[in-house]
A protein has these predicted regions:
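Intrinsic-disorder/low-complexity coil detector
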Residues: 1-2, 46
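Long, charge-rich, low-complexity alpha-helical segments
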Residues: 59-229
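Charged, low-complexity, helix/coiled-coil-prone segments
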Residues: 10-13, 41-56, 148-157
Length: 229
């Protein structure tokens, strides 16, 4: 796995179609998985002292699978460092990636790269969480915009998806129904409604969303949606 590194500026094509939902927090935005780099890409928000010294406000970082899992759990909500470390430790025991990296090393790496949650957002700064919830809503794959852009094959697939939706697992059907009736909503809207951050079911919900993305039932706005033949 590649070591943690960063890149300032620039863009590259990311395959988001089968990856976990775009994940936004007050300190970073999950951009997706790069097959070329074999790494998860996070755009991180740098603190004021870095910007005042001439650095950029946003810098892209590359995380391997284990570092990404730690980052994902640590940023499900803004929590204390003690809780953060405990969550990361629990993940270490569940991790099936070999060889396992020492937990303290990964924790320190993320902290040094400014990827750990801040105790509170800096004053007069718009958080990436707020930006992300505005620019990255989910849309159901059978939306009117999809109909307008695609051919009969898309219509056929979209209608078939609706029929198959009745046979989705309970949790996936619940999520699908929520986004069908709430255009423009994000994962965080669903998380707030179901209070999943408190009952620690966000990873299970994330897996269900990933399944829906893979099956083509829904896709985030701005992502390319191509129904399967």
């Amino acid at each position: 796995m590649p070591p943690l590194s960063s890149e300032q500026g620039g863009k590259e094509t990311l395959n988001n179609s089968t990856e976990l939902f775009r994940y936004c927090t007050s300190v970073g935005v999950y951009e997706g998985y790069s097959k070329k780099e074999k790494a998860h890409i996070v755009t991180a928000r740098m603190p004021d002292d870095v910007v005042n010294a001439g650095g950029q406000r946003f810098i892209r970082h590359y995380l391997d699978e284990y570092q990404f899992m730690v980052w994902l759990v640590c940023h499900a909500t803004i929590i204390s460092e003690d809780d953060m470390y405990e969550a990361a430790s629990d993940l270490w025991y569940e991790c099936d990636i070999q060889p396992k990296k020492p937990i303290i090393r990964s924790y320190r790496e993320l902290r040094e790269k400014k990827l750990l949650a801040m105790s509170q957002a800096e004053e007069k700064e718009v958080s990436l969480y707020e930006i992300g919830t505005q620019i990255q809503p989910y849309t159901i794959s059978l939306s009117s915009s999809i109909f307008a852009q695609r051919s009969f094959r898309v219509l056929k697939n979209a209608l078939w998806n609706t029929i198959k939706g009745n046979f989705l697992p309970k949790e996936e059907k619940k999520i699908f129904k929520f986004f069908s009736g709430n255009k423009g909503y994000t994962f965080f809207d669903y998380a707030k409604k179901e209070d999943i951050m408190e009952n620690e079911s966000y990873l299970a919900v994330g897996k269900s969303i990933k399944n829906l993305l893979q099956k083509g039932y829904m896709c985030p706005v701005g992502w390319c949606f191509m129904p399967s033949d």
